[in-house]
Amino acid sequence: MKKIAYLECPTGIAGDMCLGALIDGGVPLEYLKNQLNRLGIAAEYDLRAETVIRQGQRATKVFVDLKTKATHHDHDHSQDQTHHHHADHAPHRHLPEIQAMIKGAGLPERVERWSLAIFQNLAIAEATVHGTTPEQVHFHEVGATDALVDIVGTCLGLDWLEIDELYCAPMPTGGGTVKAAHGILPVPVPAVLQLWQQRQVPVYSNGIEKELVTPTGAAIATTLATDFCQPPAMTLAKIALGSGTIDLPLPNLLRLWIGHQPETPHLETIVTLETQIDDLNPQAIAYACEKLQAAGALDVFTQGITMKKNRLGTLLTVICPVALVEICEEILFTETSTLGIRRHTQTRSILQRRFETVATPAGEIQLKIGYRGDKIYNVQPEYEDVKAIAQQTGQSWQAIAQQALCQFPRDAES
């Protein structure tokens, strides 16, 4: 069975509401604090949770108490509340520093990957709004401690719950105005609009003239959600409620549906990016490919082609998840000479994957196993494991790989 989750956000979404729903769903508060402290921010905040009642419904409200002079942006939908982008948030951090903190924290692999993608997408949105690059944006909000807690904490919670796939409901627009570091802004604020545009998020008005979706909440949903839709088919196991701060005409709650789906042929929406280049040093193309792979592209490859005027060129193709399209396009525009990129949205069928370690006479090797339901279709030894042992022993790569495959239990393939 596959474990899925659905974010239902009738009154919007913010980072603290995500944390509240996850803790309400069973994620231990102390686990979150211990993992978050690996970012080196233990002296900057305290995290606590309380049970609250919102229009007769019990829910969990999370508070991020900053120990420096700053005001956390609770999701209170109030036009009098200062927006995420505070002028007095401390400390302010730029994107490269945030990335270094996350990469150096030793977080679970999915948590690191998700967190980096969320911050990158938010940086791209802010940079587009302010007419600069993601690395040059001075983040009042993204670099603040509370945003680190909200974003990385949400990723930790989803990983702890072992959520395989996340879906999200269409989002309410809200309305009115909000105070920000750049002055008074209309709601939805520009960064939220940009994030919605990047993912083509379906939105609607529920008639509430407050700020309902914050940049952090929008970045989390637009990066991690597979689709924005009505609730997917599932066997519902739990409903968890994360609370906002003030009362609204609707209960101020983010509802997290947690359930299971039977294992079926897995279909995944991907985007193929293509660009043709005939005026760039091959070394620069190689570097761009490395950056794309590091950013999370599913595959990157090049093909030699003949272009107009019979010039030899390169067709650079990138296959990536929908959530990473903007990131990969940013790399292509920054690192290559291309003036345009083609997008093709496709659906692919993929096998599920798991890893097992087997002991061979030469040492332990990890096997990647491709399966669907109870049937195993493919077993391959991990290249780097085989390479390391081959170099140590002087045996051929193929001989070591065959030893590993021989140790895989044959009855597991039936």
Curated annotation (Swiss-Prot):
<feature type="region of interest" description="Disordered">
    <location>
        <begin position="70"/>
        <end position="91"/>
    </location>
</feature>
<comment type="similarity">
    <text>Belongs to the LarC family.</text>
</comment>
<keyword id="KW-0533">Nickel</keyword>
<protein>
    <recommendedName>
        <fullName>Putative nickel insertion protein</fullName>
    </recommendedName>
</protein>
<dbReference type="Pfam" id="PF01969">
    <property type="entry name" value="Ni_insertion"/>
</dbReference>
<dbReference type="InterPro" id="IPR002822">
    <property type="entry name" value="Ni_insertion"/>
</dbReference>
<dbReference type="GO" id="GO:0016829">
    <property type="term" value="F:lyase activity"/>
</dbReference>
<dbReference type="GO" id="GO:0016151">
    <property type="term" value="F:nickel cation binding"/>
</dbReference>
